[in-house]
Amino acid sequence: MRKRVSGLILCFVLLFAIPLPAFASNQVNTIDIQALLYEDGSMYVTQVWKGDFNEGTESYIPMNVPDYLTISNLTVSDQNGIYDTVPDWNIDWSFEEKARKCGMNDTDSGYEICFGISRYGQNHYTIEYKLDIR
């Protein structure tokens, strides 16, 4: 009997000690980044994200750019088409308010390129922007 109880305790310990996948978390499986450098020093960047997006309202890219660079020409699209670019992104918007929209959020260390998840599940996002020299 003592062996059986010890075995059950061991099973419980192992059950909770083994990391299990988080079923509701977002997972970017691949990111493909291409950059085109112009003669004036500016750069056009295209990022393609593929993954499972199953929680939250938005995804974002922290952009800790130096003061002499600005971000322009932001566009985001997914498998269903292009998003609307809004001038003032609000991180507190609801899922519905962020759906099919993208924008910039100012932070203490730079910017965040933000876009609404729009649909839970497998998604394919294309994020494009230009880094300009002031």
Language-model segments: which ranges?
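Bacterial N-terminal signal peptides
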Residues: 9-19
